[in-house]
């Protein structure tokens, strides 16, 4: 067994992050929700034993370990596939809306949701904290990059919300600097330098549309924002409990990661590169001439 592990270490050392990503992705319970620490028994302090074993060619292989490693090898190699190209600068996370990286992800969610549900989908939202890679550099875009960016098994879900609920949703998006695609937002920083929603319109077929508080809109979010139990406003987590009051809640049977991989592949097949999209979906009212 030790020899098999040694051979595994030598053979996949350079691809170990990819292997760990695949193992993590294979765990159905993995999500952004924090795991509870194991219960501690009072006074329990078992003794520790340390030993050293030299792993070299003198130790025979273990067929079970060899078979396990061989099963992952094709998927590890698949992560090195180039699925697209980033051109025009790096994709970076930062600031309100999670920067151009947040725009890239929510643009992809909105595009893929419309492939499934049609153009009636008007808005896509995800949290900035779920984007676990700060930069995707200009150049070749690997499948591994998307796994590193989106390591969680978060599923996309359709929510049918009233216009009033959409505005409440966007208040949380703005105040916690989360990412969205489909809305044009004006915000203003409060005394604590926290951005607050001032106004919002939807961008439908290239035209700005006022949000009708009584109308019904299709919105796509990740299930994490819907299912998590912590709803108190904090510096890192917004209160998305409004999603529980949707008129309709319907899973898309698609994870956020698969949606973005599909999106990149579609863009590549159409001859388009992924470009940093620093558009005006978030505009400061102060910068636009308002007062603070």
PLM features: what roles do these ranges have?
Residues 15-28:
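Bacterial N-terminal signal peptides
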